[in-house]
Amino acid sequence: MSVEIALDGSKMRPDIWKKLSVEDNYYLDSGFYFYQQLLRHDGMMLHASAVVVDGYAYLFSGPCGMGKSTHTAMYKKTFPDAVIINDDKPALRRIDGIWYVFGTPWCGKDGINVNTSAPLGGICFLHRGDTLLRRLTALEALPQFLRQTYGRDTAQDAKLLMSLLDDLLRNIPVFEFFNHAVPGDEQITYQAMREAIGRKEKTL
């Protein structure tokens, strides 16, 4: 996949982001253009923090303030080989029937990003609340995805996105985790998603 982004200012929308600097406008507009093109290459963006452990990428998504970065930071502390490859907007792509996660330059205020990729192991939507983890059905997961991705600006984009989500939800385990962002939470999500991968591997 190759996408050329010409930062000539032609797509800038200062009327929408009036309080942002020129550089921030470029950052946002180039990101939106990339996400749109990604849909045309069997991929999508997800608002999430992505961490790689034991060769698989795990994504933690949800609204701002739900502790996505906090959760992946706990992975870094607990698992020696953990690498956060993107802390805000990783790219997901289906290549030869397998889903992969890629780092992108659109990585949030802390700039945490690694230009690498890994097979997608699982996705978990975070919420505040007493500790509860459960696997979601495709019907339950879909609304949460739609709130945290791009792809509904045009009918064509929406069609591409829904086709990709249909495949992803059939093949990737998706969970939701209510928590208070305390040490040990990372063990709960890791064990659940790793077990789901193990069950899938046994069927292949």
Regions found by a protein language model. Name each.
Residues H71-T72:
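Post-Walker A alpha-helix
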Residues E4-A6, M45, V174-E176:
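Ordered hydrophobic segments in well-structured contexts
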